[in-house]
Design a protein with these regions (language model features):
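Conserved SAM/SAH-binding loop
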Residues: 90-94, 437-442
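Short, hinge-like loop/turn segments at secondary-structure boundaries
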Residues: 39-42, 175-176, 214-216, 426-429
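Short, conserved catalytic or adaptor-binding loops enriched in Gly and charged residues
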Residues: 14-15, 74-82, 335
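A conserved SF2-helicase RecA2
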Residues: 2-8, 12-73
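Short, flexible loop/turn segments with low-complexity composition
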Residues: 50-58, 249-253, 432-441
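Short alpha-helix adjacent to the SAM-binding motif of class I
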Residues: 6-7, 36, 416-427
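Core catalytic lobe of class I
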Residues: 83-420
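Short, conserved SAM-binding/catalytic segment
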Residues: 76-82, 422-438
């Protein structure tokens, strides 16, 4: 309905001087679609009429009162659990206040990006704040609880991203960057966490521009001085001091068996990059027939094994464009980092939102990539331990925890996200608990 309505509205919205006859052409099999469309059109007219009456009676100020009437304090806690997980639909501050001290082995979460998004129409929502200062005032109730429930020596891994401030909102006429990640660092340090550093996760500037329109090629050609760069994501690492700081080992260390976890594997994990063969750049002739996934794979292998050459990088991308192989919806040949603290190989499309789309369910606004969560859990927890996400979303963190032999705990305020997450947690538990052929033979 929204798409059809917008298309119709555009016909007479922009200074139309003559009458317009509108014909809706549909097949006999589409009769129900037409019926539904006309029903929604009638509902739209009724809504416009009511809103017009409200404005006439109360003025524009009355709309704020109407919005306030639609917002409420969350007070309908629900809890579901399995053998390996527990998911709670409630305010995370209230839940953390009831948890035992030193009961969580690892915290992995993606906090709301200040007031950038609101996930629920409740006063409890962390996104329902006027400013960064107000957001962190609300966080002041949660962060001390995370410090209390985390075991000594263990980590809180906080996924954040700097925020884009658009020129039409700031009055600057151009987008600028709000250093939200830096504010987050000082917030957690204020509450006693020790800052251990940050992991940088490269983002796709082409995809980002499709969402924000701030790095457009046409605008850059007009004046490159107003252009910034893409915003990477960060995982900020904070540690609760152990009881004994003489050697700073955690009270319950995260240990690795050298027979199972080799030096070679550690070096690869520490560098956060996967080396593979592919010692030649894809030829321009091969490029004509190769799929973009193959081109991308070979390009990244080549970049990791050779000294970076900017002109060669640009030339290769331009050849892709000539052959019609350069996508406009994602970056095919993004820069490959050789730095150990930058993760440039995260599969950005590998989130639980992919499953949400396949099942035609509501997508999460800011999905957390599975790759990031898996690496953090494997690196900073032992098998069988409890991994907690206070901003659970659709259950990414407990889902990964179960898959990796841990236990998962999450809280989430949005009922739809929480409910969708239950199916993923049950699915993960069923997979790891399913008996193998050898188990059945033993029976």
């Amino acid at each position: 309905f929204n798409d059809k309505f917008q298309a119709i509205a555009r016909i007479y919205r922009f200074m139309q001087k003559h009458p317009v006859d509108l014909y809706l052409v549909y097949a006999e099999s589409e009769g129900e679609i037409f019926k539904s469309f006309m029903q929604k059109w009638a509902q739209h007219r009724e809504m416009v009429s009511k809103m017009t009456d409200i404005v006439r009676e109360n003025g524009l100020f009355g709309l704020q009162a109407e919005e306030k009437m639609m917002r409420w304090m969350f007070a309908s806690r629900e809890e579901k659990s399995g053998k390996l997980w527990k998911a709670i639909n409630n305010d995370n501050v209230l839940e953390c206040q009831k948890m035992e001290s030193n009961s969580v082995d690892l915290v992995v979460t993606s906090i709301p990006f200040s007031n950038h998004y609101e996930y629920t129409p409740t006063y409890n929502d962390f996104g329902h704040n006027e400013s960064n200062d107000k957001f962190f005032e609300q966080m002041d109730y949660l962060t001390p609880e995370l410090m209390r429930i985390l075991k000594p020596g263990r980590l809180a891994c906080i996924h954040v991203k700097d925020r884009v401030l658009f020129g039409n909102a700031t009055g600057d006429g151009m987008p600028t960057i709000d250093p939200f990640s830096e504010m987050t660092v000082f917030h957690y340090m204020k509450h006693g966490f020790r800052y251990m550093g940050r992991i940088t996760v490269d983002t796709d500037v082409v995809r980002e521009n499709n969402q924000t329109y701030r790095l457009g090629y046409t605008e850059m050609c007009k004046d490159g001085s107003k252009m910034g760069i893409g915003c990477p994501e960060y995982v900020l690492l904070f540690r609760k001091l152990p009881s004994d700081t003489s050697r700073a080992y955690a009270d319950l260390p995260v240990t690795k068996n050298k027979n199972e976890y080799s030096l070679a594997r550690w070096q690869i994990d520490a560098h956060a990059s996967w080396k593979s063969s592919g010692n030649t750049l894809l030829s321009y002739e091969d490029m004509k027939v190769a799929g973009i996934d193959k081109i991308r794979h070979l390009f990244r292998n080549y970049e990791r094994e050779h000294i970076y050459n900017y002109e060669e990088h640009v030339a290769f991308a331009e050849e892709l464009e000539v052959y019609g192989k350069l996508p406009k919806t994602f970056m095919a040949v993004d820069p490959v980092s050789k730095k150990p603290w930058i993760w440039d190989d995260v599969t950005r499309m590998r989130t639980l939102n992919t499953k949400q789309s396949q099942k035609k369910r509501q997508n999460h606004i800011c999905p957390l990539q599975l790759d990031i969560v898996e690496r953090l859990i494997e690196r900073y927890s032992n098998k069988g331990e409890l991994v907690f996400d206070p901003f659970g979303g659709i259950g990414t963190v407990p889902y990964c925890a179960i898959k990796l032999g841990r236990r998962g705990l999450s809280t989430e305020l949005n009922y739809d996200y929480w409910k969708d997450g239950l199916s993923y947690l049950r699915e993960a538990e069923n997979e790891v608990s399913a008996p193998t052929l050898f188990d059945l033979m033993a029976i």
